């Protein structure tokens, strides 16, 4: 029966909300109460008219007002919110919001009083938002979710952020009311407001044992608001004093319960999510970052992303804003603590962070380096990419930075397993992908359990960051021989390292067993014998290192000699193995000679054989000149930064490759090659579009997009390092560049070609050079600098990107016509390029269109004419009378030459104007000819157009 009544009441409310008579009466009442405290006769008459025409609805509405058990029922409220009448009502009365706010302010609601966020001025702005259908729909979704039995606050927050970016008036509201909003949030976190008491009122009154209290409020509905406003001194209320004694006692007890239960509505959120109140100081700045905050929040809740990816985006936002950067530099723990709060309060996020060992340790490190948010961003970005080498490199590189106290933190965190977690993260990633590290551990006779023993050296090496970096790098690459050599070299200065090696003799005996397996004498020893002689060997680190180095170079004669020398110095390893070593030395040179012949034969075929990254890098020159044939080979490991251009990998197996970062695939033969399951690694390469055969278009497109992303990342890194002001976000700049790529194919082809030329990390400075830096033109043009510089100059000095790109394109075409390959003509190219940049800047003004000059025919004509002008002013080089080689004297680059260049530009513009006038005249003729002559006129127009474009 109760359910039926609820539905009936719902229908009553919806009918009243939809009634034109009720709306007129309400509108009149709002007008009256906002200007005075009394109701006008007109409003009374309008109300009476509604009552007389809707007596049943009026009766039920009054009855509902006295039945708080119904109107406070979440299901009843949710049912109302799910249907349209209430939202149509809100839209219809949106213009009345400032007046309603004025009425509520008079009634004592602090949120609506002057200088509050929702005062009359604020509501004048917000009323425009509620005329927007999209805003109302989002508001409906938010309201319904809040009324759910188990509210999904992530969903609520996401919808709020969606709503705030839906209408531009919200941003206007933030701009004008940011201080008041900050005050409101501060109050919500620190003060108990009347609205907080009201919530407690309603929550307590829903309890079955509060029926008598509920009856009092239903009989005296106006007492509720008065008590809320005077909860600490109810005796001043006349209506309170007129109650019966028992009622007064009940209410007094009830008010104590309300005060005990009430708390600032934001306090719980601030405490749960470890939000420091200091963050309120930057609320005005954050309110201007709503789109960025939305992206951060969406990332937090996106599958396979979570808290660390969202933290990365948050740090990127901080690093790109001077105010945020300054704030977080002075409040280093706020952002990491918030991230930790999110982890602790979100079970789904906890499962992700536990899986990848992304725990409090990294957040502590990030907290320490927040005085330089760009470094904190790099650390989290590397962590998210799983780039543990770069991550460790970044951490190690700042250990000795006096602005941080990182060393002490790392020592402390290492006791809690920091390095164990890092390396276990590497191992887990390896198991899920290629299992290269696992295989290398097996090759060296070790198990995964030995890894934790390897990590114990890390804290000891904190005093030697470069060595720590090398050791970690060699571990990740599986080069345990090189790692051991580095540690042995450090024993001379640090007895703790020698002690560590002796304490872990079993591991390092396995490594030496693998390393020295081809050395006569030593190769006859088992691991136990190596275990026994390791302390003696460590007493002579230089000699032991010499042995390892000779093995690394495959100098087996030298390795045998070095072993013999080491054996003599240790009295044949303290007398333990004299016969084996002597026998090995006697036969060693014959064996070593055969080994050398085998390894350094003129050519080798690796078909169906495994070739690891170390071998590939060591013999890359032989691979590139064809002496080592990789067709059908099984490639293994991290092959980053390898130039495979012109190499045939036909039928090769790349499924065990873990990285192809910065590899060059220009003219690389991949016919019938088995590619890695994770094709995404190909997007981090160069010249993928020039591989043979052509790979999937979407893969090439992704690789080219990655190139552009890298270029922009590099530009922003330098801009931030120089602390230059950035007027827009990286995301906005990327969008600007994407538009540039889409609107002009010539520019797109040029950008992709240059970014593919070689890895961008080889370009150290993006500023326009003041003087020429290169001997040959090829050094200028075969470089991503041709793209990176225009992007940099756009941000740093507001220079037009397309104009500078056009100047580069034109300079290259002119130089090609004058100098062909351009040997020794780097200075000439530089002078041409600089003059053209200054001229092109003038033609990039709004009235001129660079795209016209970029059209193929115009570009070729312009290049030819300018080249002819320069040729006429050139001189022969010393041998030019024989070879026809020319150069351009510096003195010709003057105002006169500049005017000559401009004349060539103007000629193109004049031709374009003439063509435009001809077309315009012909179009006029088409409009005035009669029907009989229309066909002839169109034929004439087509014929003329053909002549123009010849």
From Swiss-Prot:
It comes from the Bacteria. It comes from Rickettsia prowazekii (strain Madrid E). Pfam families: Pentapeptide. This is Uncharacterized protein RP511. InterPro entries: 5peptide_repeat (IPR001646).
């Amino acid at each position: 029966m109760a359910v039926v009544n609820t539905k009936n009441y719902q229908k009553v409310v919806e009918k009243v909300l939809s009634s034109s008579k009720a709306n007129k009466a309400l509108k009149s009442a709002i007008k009256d109460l906002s200007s005075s405290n009394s109701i006008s006769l007109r409003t009374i008459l309008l109300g009476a008219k509604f009552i007389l025409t809707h007596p049943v609805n009026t009766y039920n509405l009054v009855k509902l007002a006295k039945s708080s058990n119904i109107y406070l029922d979440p299901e009843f409220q949710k049912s109302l919110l799910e249907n349209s009448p209430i939202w149509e009502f809100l839209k219809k009365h949106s213009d009345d919001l400032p007046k309603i706010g004025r009425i509520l302010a008079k009634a004592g609601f602090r949120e609506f009083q002057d200088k509050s966020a929702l005062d009359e001025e604020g509501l004048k702005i917000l009323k425009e938002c509620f005329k927007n259908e999209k805003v109302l729909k989002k508001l409906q979704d938010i309201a319904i979710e809040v009324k759910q039995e188990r509210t999904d606050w992530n969903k609520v927050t996401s919808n709020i952020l969606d709503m705030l970016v839906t209408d531009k008036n919200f941003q206007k509201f933030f701009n004008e009311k940011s201080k008041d909003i900050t005050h409101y949030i501060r109050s919500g976190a620190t003060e108990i407001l009347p609205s907080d008491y009201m919530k407690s009122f309603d929550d307590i009154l829903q309890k079955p044992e509060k029926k008598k209290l509920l009856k009092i409020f239903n009989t005296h509905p106006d007492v509720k608001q008065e008590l809320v406003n005077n909860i600490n001194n109810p005796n001043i209320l006349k209506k309170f004093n007129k109650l019966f004694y028992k009622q007064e006692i009940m209410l007094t007890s009830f008010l104590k319960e309300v005060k005990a239960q009430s708390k600032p509505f934001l306090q719980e959120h601030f405490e749960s999510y470890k939000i420091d109140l200091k963050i309120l100081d930057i609320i005005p700045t954050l309110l201007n970052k709503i789109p960025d905050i939305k992206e951060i929040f969406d990332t937090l809740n996106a599958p396979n992303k979570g808290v660390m990816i969202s933290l990365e985006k948050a740090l990127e936002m901080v690093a790109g804003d001077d105010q945020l950067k300054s704030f977080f530099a002075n409040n280093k723990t706020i952002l990491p603590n918030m991230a930790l709060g999110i982890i602790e309060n979100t079970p789904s996020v906890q499962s992700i962070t536990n899986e990848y060992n992304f725990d409090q340790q990294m957040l502590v490190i990030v907290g320490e380096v927040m005085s330089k948010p760009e470094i904190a961003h790099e650390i989290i970005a590397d962590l998210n990419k799983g780039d543990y080498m770069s991550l460790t490199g970044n951490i190690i590189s700042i250990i000795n930075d006096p602005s941080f106290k990182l060393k002490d933190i790392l020592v402390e965190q290492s006791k809690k397993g920091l390095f164990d977690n890092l390396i276990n993260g590497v191992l887990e990633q390896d198991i899920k992908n290629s299992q290269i590290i696992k295989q290398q551990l097996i090759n060296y006779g070790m198990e995964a359990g030995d890894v934790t023993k390897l990590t114990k050296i890390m804290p000891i090496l904190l005093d030697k960051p470069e060595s720590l970096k090398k050791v970690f790098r060699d571990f990740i690459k599986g080069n345990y021989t090189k790692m051991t050599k580095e540690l042995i070299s450090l024993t001379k200065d640090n007895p703790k390292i020698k002690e560590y090696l002796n304490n872990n003799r079993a591991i390092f005996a396995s490594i030496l067993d693998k390393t020295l397996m081809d050395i006569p004498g030593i190769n006859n020893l088992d691991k136990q014998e190596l275990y026994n002689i390791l302390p003696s060997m460590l007493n002579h680190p230089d000699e032991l290192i010499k042995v390892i180095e000779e093995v690394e170079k495959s100098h087996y004669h030298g390795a045998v000699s070095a072993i013999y020398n080491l054996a003599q110095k240790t009295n044949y390893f303290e007398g333990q193995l004299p016969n084996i070593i002597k026998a090995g030395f006697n036969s060693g040179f014959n064996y070593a000679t055969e080994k050398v012949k085998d390894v350094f034969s003129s050519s080798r075929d690796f078909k169906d054989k495994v070739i690891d990254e170390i071998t590939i890098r060591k013999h890359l020159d032989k691979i590139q000149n064809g002496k080592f044939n990789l067709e059908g080979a099984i490639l293994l490991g991290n092959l980053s930064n390898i130039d495979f251009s012109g190499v045939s990998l036909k039928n090769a197996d790349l499924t065990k490759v873990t990285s192809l970062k910065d590899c060059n695939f220009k003219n690389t033969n991949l016919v019938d090659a088995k590619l890695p399951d994770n094709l995404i690694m190909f997007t981090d390469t160069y010249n993928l579009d020039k591989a043979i055969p052509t790979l999937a278009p979407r893969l090439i497109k992704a690789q080219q997009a990655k190139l552009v992303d890298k270029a922009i990342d590099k530009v922003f890194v330098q801009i931030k390092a120089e602390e230059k002001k950035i007027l827009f976000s990286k995301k906005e700049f990327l969008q600007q560049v994407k538009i540039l790529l889409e609107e002009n194919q010539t520019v797109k082809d040029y950008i992709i070609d240059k970014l593919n030329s070689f890895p961008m990390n080889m370009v150290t400075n993006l500023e326009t050079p003041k003087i020429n830096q290169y001997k040959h033109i090829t050094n200028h043009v075969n470089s991503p600098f041709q793209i990176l510089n225009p992007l940099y100059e756009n941000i740093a000095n507001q220079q037009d990107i397309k104009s500078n790109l056009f100047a580069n394109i034109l300079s290259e075409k002119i130089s090609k016509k004058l100098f062909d390959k351009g040997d020794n003509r780097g200075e000439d190219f530089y002078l041409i390029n600089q003059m053209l940049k200054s001229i092109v800047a003038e033609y990039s003004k709004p009235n001129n269109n660079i795209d016209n000059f970029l059209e193929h025919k115009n570009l070729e004509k312009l290049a030819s004419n300018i080249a002819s002008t320069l040729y006429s002013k050139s001189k022969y080089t010393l041998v030019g009378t024989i070879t026809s080689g020319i150069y351009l004297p510096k003195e010709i680059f003057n105002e006169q030459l500049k005017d000559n260049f401009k004349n060539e530009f103007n000629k193109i513009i004049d031709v374009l104007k003439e063509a435009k006038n001809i077309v315009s005249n012909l179009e006029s003729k088409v409009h005035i000819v009669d029907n009989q002559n229309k066909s002839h006129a169109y034929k004439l127009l087509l014929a003329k157009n053909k002549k123009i474009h010849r």
